[in-house]
Amino acid sequence: MSESLRIIFAGTPDFAARHLDALLSSGHNVVGVFTQPDRPAGRGKKLMPSPVKVLAEEKGLPVFQPVSLRPQENQQLVADLQADVMVVVAYGLILPKAVLEMPRLGCINVHGSLLPRWRGAAPIQRSLWAGDAETGVTIMQMDVGLDTGDMLYKLSCPITAEDTSGTLYDKLAELGPQGLITTLKQLADGTAKPEVQDETLVTYAEKLSKEEARIDWSLSAAQLERCIRAFNPWPMSWLEIEGQPVKVWKASVIDTATNAAPGTILEANKQGIQVATGDGILNLLSLQPAGKKAMSAQDLLNSRREWFVPGNRLA
């Protein structure tokens, strides 16, 4: 039974904590938890524990927070737990080859894409921005490469026209634990069937940046609408007006051709703020000026109509 496996869990954010909670709720034997060191957070920059640490301490589990797993003494922390398998979910630290080889069944990782598509740091956002019809989770055997290990189990879900990275995150946080628990059972039973990744199908999900989230009006309206959903809730797509950043929470595509230069404001009314793009028209529906809450286009026009005069161009 997989419940008899000695499991080390390594993870840091809420996404990882949901997987740890599922393991504990289903009776698995977690013998130790590794998570990143407490970090300064909030206005007061007070040291805050990770969601994984909070949960582990609530459950009375041993918690380890090394800055790195490269030093021999930190690797010994792993070895001393004599684990059968190490489960890694959004841990944030590199596992050296020596650590990968310590557990009897190796280390397995929950990755937020259908590998080999979207290896890397931002698979949820990249799949949405690219217009993929579906995404999912892959449970894989870890090796020294970046998300290059053999695939053990996959679960998929559709990407809808309303999905944001936030909603996809929640969907995958539900799928991941299901796939993880199934995989652990298969590993314990000896029924797991590792599948080598097809290198011809590999794409990379590079880390997001705030500058990348700045709206580029030369792109098509369809691309920009996906970008806005992909960058919600972080880092948020934004545009600049009078030197101020304005976040865009929601937009829609108007399939009408226009000869106006990209970035030109075409209309500004209660239906939204219509802006010409490289292909089609983007209708801005919900925006957030600096220091304010998100609001409808209509509410913003009531206070800042001078920002959106038809014929003017947005930078």
From Swiss-Prot:
Spell out the InterPro entries in the cross-references: Fmt, Formyl_trans_C, Formyl_trans_C_sf, Formyl_transf_N, Formyl_transf_N_sf, Formyl_transferase-like_C_sf, GART_AS, Met-tRNA-FMT_C
GO MF annotation list: methionyl-tRNA formyltransferase activity
User: EC top class, in one word?
Assistant: transferase
Q: Which UniProt keywords apply?
A: Protein biosynthesis, Transferase
Cross-referenced Gene3D superfamilies: Formyl transferase, C-terminal domain, Formyl transferase, N-terminal domain
EC numbers, comma separated: 2.1.2.9
For the keyword Secreted, the answer is no
Q: Where (6S)-5,6,7,8-tetrahydrofolate is bound, by residue? A: S113, L114, L115, P116
| Origin superkingdom | Bacteria
* Any one annotated GO CC term: cytosol
Matching HAMAP family, A to Z?
A: Formyl_trans
Q: What does this protein do?
A: Attaches a formyl group to the free amino group of methionyl-tRNA(fMet). The formyl group appears to play a dual role in the initiator identity of N-formylmethionyl-tRNA by promoting its recognition by IF2 and preventing the misappropriation of this tRNA by the elongation apparatus.
What is the similarity comment for this entry? Belongs to the Fmt family.
Supply the name of the protein: Methionyl-tRNA formyltransferase
Please report the organism this UniProt entry assigns to the protein: Shigella dysenteriae serotype 1 (strain Sd197)
What lineage does UniProt assign to this protein's organism? Bacteria, Pseudomonadati, Pseudomonadota, Gammaproteobacteria, Enterobacterales
Q: Which gene does this sequence derive from?
A: fmt
